Amino acid sequence: LTQSMAIIEYLDEKYPQINLMPADIENRARVRQLAQITACDIHPLNNLRVLKYLKKELNVEDDDKDNWYQHWIIQGFNALEESIKKSRLTGPYCMGEKLSLVDLCLIPQMYNAHRFKVSMENYPILSEIEKTCLALDAFQQATPEKQIDAI
């Protein structure tokens, strides 16, 4: 498998004791909606392949490339922050008390947003979720610096 969402769903189904999807159909749909804001609206415009294309093929200056990144992450984070605020269940994660697929999609984008110096002042909910997730060992072990192929 090579696509993040397919990998996450595969692992969720293979190891059901972790259960990244809520049991009820409404919250399952909500998880998919929130996860897709990140996976479909933010990530495709800001992945490494796109950023390299902007730089190497279109000769976009670094400042303009950074502005591109910031524009699209801000658009996505605005939508995500507002969506979570409107429907957030009580708890430290995107869907309340339990870690979900949404959190797994959010944290890598938060990492990239910091890397591209996106201000988090307008995203208190996302920032609090990030803080909670990064306190977990699994998220600490998954940071890019800890990966064997880190650049």
Regions found by a protein language model. Give the residues of each.
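Short, solvent-exposed alpha-helical surface patches in well-structured domains
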Residues: 30-33, 128, 141
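GST-like fold's C-terminal all-alpha helical module
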Residues: 38-135
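Active-site-flanking alpha-helical
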Residues: 12, 109-110, 143
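Carbohydrate-binding/catalytic loop surfaces
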Residues: 147-151
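Short coil/turn segments at secondary-structure boundaries
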Residues: 47-48, 143-145
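Conserved beta-strand positions that form and line the central face of beta-propeller blades
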Residues: 19-20, 92, 138
